[in-house]
Amino acid sequence: MSQKWVYKFTEGNANMRNLLGGKGANLAEMTNLGLPIPQGFTVTTEACTDYYNSGKKITEEIQGQIFDALKWLEAEQGKQFGDVNDPLLVSVRSGARASMPGMMDTILNLGLNDISVEGFAKKTGNPRFAYDSYRRFIQMFSDVVMEVPKSFFEKIIDELKEEKGVHFDTELTAEDLKELIGRFKKIYSENMDGAEFPQDPRVQLMEAVKAVFRSWDNPRAIVYRRMNDIPGDWGTAVNVQAMVFGNMGDTSGTGVAFTRNPSTGAKGIFGEYLINAQGEDVVAGVRTPQPISRLAEDMPECYAQFMELAMKLENHYRDMQDMEFTIQEGKLYFLQTRNGKRTAQAALQIACDLVDEGKITPQEAVLRIEAKSLDQLLHPTFDPEALKSGEVIGSALPASPGAAAGRVYFSADEAKMAHMRGDRVILVRLETSPEDIEGMHASEGILTVRGGMTSHAAVVARGMGTCCVSGCGEIKIDEEAKVFSLGGYTFHEGDYISLDGSTGKIYKGDIKTVEASVSGNFGRIMMWADKFRKLQVRTNADTPADTENAVKLGAEGIGLCRTEHMFFDPERIPKIRKMILSDTQEAREAALMELLPYQKEDFKAMYKALKGRPMTIRYLDPPLHEFVPTEEADIEALAKDMGLTKEQVQQKCNELHEFNPMMGHRGCRLAVTFPEIAKMQTRAVIEAAIEVKEECDYDIVPEIMIPLVGDKKELKFVKTVVDDTAKQVMDEKKIYINYHVGTMIEIPRAALLADEIAEEAEFFSFGTNDLTQMTFGFSRDDAGKFLSSYYESKIYESDPFAKLDQNGVGKLVKMAAEKGRATRKDLKLGICGEHGGDPSSVEFCHQVGLNYVSCSPFRVPIARLAAAQAALKEQA
């Protein structure tokens, strides 16, 4: 029996998502529920994988199954594909397993040609509608399938409207549209080396299926997948569906609706529609639509039926639904439903409401929230004082919440470049398209002239947590000249504007923003998450302010305090430079004694902010050359302070130069060559702990972490210095406290010898930033130059510095954990690289059995939620 590559909607269900894609599985499920669905069939994701494996060809077997399904659809609809009197027309849409809005391309009205369009005009008795459908098909097919730029066609439409003296597409007559079709076909031919527009509907269909498969690998899809951790080998399914028409006159229309508000989560239908339009007009945001409540006046029966079925869908899926619908001459059809994309704020509101309504459990609520999206909750709002003097120059649709201020840029590329220069960017576009994804990602905010709350800009911005205001029709924009005018002002590239994505207001100038405060739903979801998770979550912090912030966000301690960051203060850096450039141990010790009070006060402030929570203190790690002066004035000041000549200081600085400093004289190697550094740091740690215990009665157990260890003897050497100094301090103070000495596992050799190192270390913390660098053999600072080529060539799927490489680096982590605990059963294990705040890496840490993850303060909620999700998935 040959493999089944094609499924009718009547043959699938919601559980077949991996095979049929999200859209195909939902269309099958809606068919099973008895909803009014235009019938059709799905070409599976496996067929997409086969297409790539077969050298980008569709095999005869798959093509045969597509044509068999087409025969069934013809019988079902009572129409023939390519018929000259009453042709069957279909839409061809992509549908991957994971929702990827605007990443894949849609083709409508497929099956029309020069002859069948006349039969279609006769059958419908509506020539204008028939020719409008044909011109749309030529335009979409040329753009999506043959890559003839859409702008070529838009330009011709504008020229024709000018010639005919009309403003809107809808004012063009059937004769005008015939003329337009002729011009469109000419453009097609000119761009396709003289080839004519294909007239055989079967050729059209197979080309369209191939185009959807190809679009799985277009640059914007690759970028979206990398940003959202979607594997490249999943492939996309293709849905072929009988057409229904929303552009057959005033009793037809098309719309997009959500069963709850996707920005706030408020209960109640939220959406919009256009009378006499096709679906892509709403989604692409080409015309600005009406709110869904108006449908009750325009078509009350359709509205009542729609409301009933929308609630049926939400109750069935037990989640907020995003639905596309078309009304053809008074009859309602659903074209798709899916769990709606939503802001983080809305996700929390909806999850809590669904628990209160008894539709889902707290466990399900926790699993439903995308951990990464919590980032959005910590988004800025405008400073209330600054806002008082803000001048509103316009307002439009509040498409994605948050406040943003920045310089205006008019293209995605310019936005990206400006962002790389360090500018805050507001991307201003007539409308955004999927090609703009990287520019949108680089922007603080997005402002569009066209498009509604469900346009491409709105959906993508909400998904990324970027502030967006859409559909500001008052703007007069010239993207070529890089200028727009609004509210009586003219803005050029580089001028400042501010946007409020929660109200839709647009302000002149650069208004100060402030960090967000989180709401009650956040606390509720976090309370559930904390109940379910096993992993502890700590933070990486070097200042009391960072520490307080992280504790507010739920951090249970500090997993990495980088002591060197405390030395970069302008008051302190001369003292560390003096220590570095001193020739004798005595001079070094004298300089270190000047630093001791600063370091001790810092630790005291951190301990107080932590109120007894644990803190892991990493001893001095960076290469010494990072501290030496480079500015002329600093060199002179240091020379004067040390009683040396400028030339002597310069020479000493030059001697510290290393060819490969990241693998040079740093980490524990500093403590081996200059034990006095470790002595000073130990004295500061222990004295601070004793004094805070006396002042605040906190029971502090310092965790002292020695970095860059590659050998047990290395650790033993530094640990002896620490133990001797700690004993000396405690003897002086006559107060004795517990402390632990551990190490960072960041050199592959340390992972290989973890069983030996655990004889000395009381805890391991995986420094996955350096462990990744040393395992891959490339530097974090330089890898960006070539990694993009690796993504394009599908060598790597994601940035190994952002998402832990479980195949390589992960194996070292797992091995070190197992070997370490074989030696010391109670060995505490944590991770303190940037990976500590990445959800998939947190899940890995849970599986390997680490005790905690540590991440930057604002990622603490993400890690808490990801840890709970990992525990719940394991139970399931």
Which functions belong to the PLM regions below?
Residues 239, 409, 426-428, 447, ...:
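Structural motif
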Residues 444-450, 468, 830:
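A short, small-residue-rich loop immediately preceding and capping a beta-strand
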Residues 464-466:
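Residues forming the flavin
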Residues 1-390, 417, 423-426, 433-438, ...:
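Nucleotide/phosphate-binding sheet-loop regions of phosphoryl- and nucleotidyl-transfer enzymes
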Residues 395-435, 486-524:
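Extended, non-globular alpha-helical segments
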Residues 93-94, 518, 528-876:
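Conserved alpha/beta-domain cores
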